[in-house]
Amino acid sequence: MKTDFTIEGNLVDIRQRSIYPARLVISDGKIRTIRRLNAAKTRYILPGFVDAHVHIESSMLVPTEFAKVAVTHGTVATVSDPHEIANVLGTDGVWYMIENGQKSPLKFNFGAPSCVPATSFETAGAEVTAEDIAHLLASPEVRYLAEMMNWPGVIFDDPSVQHKLDIAKRAGKPVDGHAPGLMGKQALKYISKGISTDHECYMIDEARFKLKHGMKVIIREGSAAKNFDTLAPLINKYFGQMMFCSDDKHPDDLLEGHINLLVKRAVARGIDVFKVLQMACINPVEHYGLDVGTLQQGDWADLIIVDNLTDFNVLKTYINGDVVSERGRDYIKTEPERIVNNFNIGLKKPSDFALPLTKTDINVIEVLDGQLITKVFEGKISLENGLATPSVSDDILKVSVVNRYSEVPVATAFIKNFGLKRGAIASSVAHDSHNIIVVGVTDEAICEAVNALIAQKGGLSATDGTHTEVLPLPIAGLMSNESAEIVAEKYTALVNMARDLGSTLTSPFMSLSFMALLVIPSLKLSDKGLFDGEKFVFCPIER
């Protein structure tokens, strides 16, 4: 039994829209009593923040290391989709995340991945079947059916997709959505299937349409996709249906802040603080039925102390009544984590990346900085002895996807807006199947960047052709077994090297990791070829 203790401060009662000085008595991890006081206090007591949709693997940290950083920013819980590791290791990967997360006080709430592999147009390392989903959802540790990315399968009544939705309905667990740009009759059909959220809205009219028809919209601000500024104007009217999430956040950005930064930005825009805090603290708990306290008598003492309601500097974070962080320092103990992986290929040759073509007019993937969507650019390249060569002056570079699960030919196409003038950058974090993706100026540099990752069985790399830097990610080729600070330092060095090579993207490795994500339009590349994400068919390189 824990010793009772008290916490005093200006209590922010979000539901009652009131702030008053109070003394909380914490007993056995829960709020036993809340007593009003007469004198105002200098600090504020809030419910802890909840990230309503995040892939922990994108931080390149295992859950326990993610938790050590997140709690310093006032995060007490996450709604986490483990489909990244599931694409590599199947349900073994899901349980790896759950078991690792249980070693931490942070309340990780994992979902059952709904689309592994994401499509049939790529090669993943594993499959999560409907039977697997049923077993996962039968477990109390699995809270929901994770994002249904196969929106064509939903709106065209694919039996296998409907079966998964039915399993979630029978289990009484919510279904997360993923339908970027979907509006009108197609969106209505998607919503009618019981899919309740979408974190992929990138247009205000799209988000408004979905909100009007009953969906919950989660405002995303990650390392690559940043939708806060676009969607924030909807908060005043629709705050009861909205939440905040990071989705995919690299370690350097996570060290800077988490959901607390979105709260601060929203309040700075003049949005009512109670509306903002309802999105950050209350709505995810209620929507997903999380076992997370919201500062009510009898709740778990999952709360934070902040200095004011403008900056939201986190002084202390409590989870189940335990202090897990104080003034930027965490109190979470970790232990070495076992290595799991799925990497089955040998080293490549520069000739593996050669691309024979007969035409010089081609379809090019056009990257949009700060977005996961791409455009189709009508580009022109040169041919040398029948082989396509990049046009560095026009910023049209080679992009290749290397299947890491079996020895098959490399898929190569062209991409614009990475800005590299020399060298190459590569990643085994390549949503969602997590093959190796690489962008570069020459076949030799591309091959060097890829081989550096094959040798390490996963990671991120950058090369100028003579010098190569690598951030190893030995756990599933997605996560490090080192601390957030070490990973962030190595990652920042790689980003700086990418910029030295010419990249002008805000987050070149995060953007690179989404260039093989076929379920987000318009043009992407899988290990099987160039893909039209709007028509959901393969696309010729030559025009």
Set out the residue ranges of the language-model regions.
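Active-site neighborhood of phospho(di)ester-bond hydrolases with catalytic His/Asp-centered motifs
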Residues: L46-H53, S80-H83, G111, A146-M148, ...
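Active-site mouth loops of central-metabolism enzymes
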Residues: V50-V62, P117-A130, S196
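Active-site microenvironment of metallo-dependent hydrolases
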Residues: M1-A22, S27, R32-R35, V71-H73, ...
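Short, ordered loop/turn segments at secondary-structure junctions
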Residues: P82-I85, P113-S114, N150, P180-G181, ...
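Divalent-metal coordination cores built from histidine and acidic residues
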Residues: A67-P174, V470-P472
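Histidine/acidic residue-rich metal-binding segments in metalloenzymes
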Residues: G93, E127-A146, G153-I218, S223-F244, ...
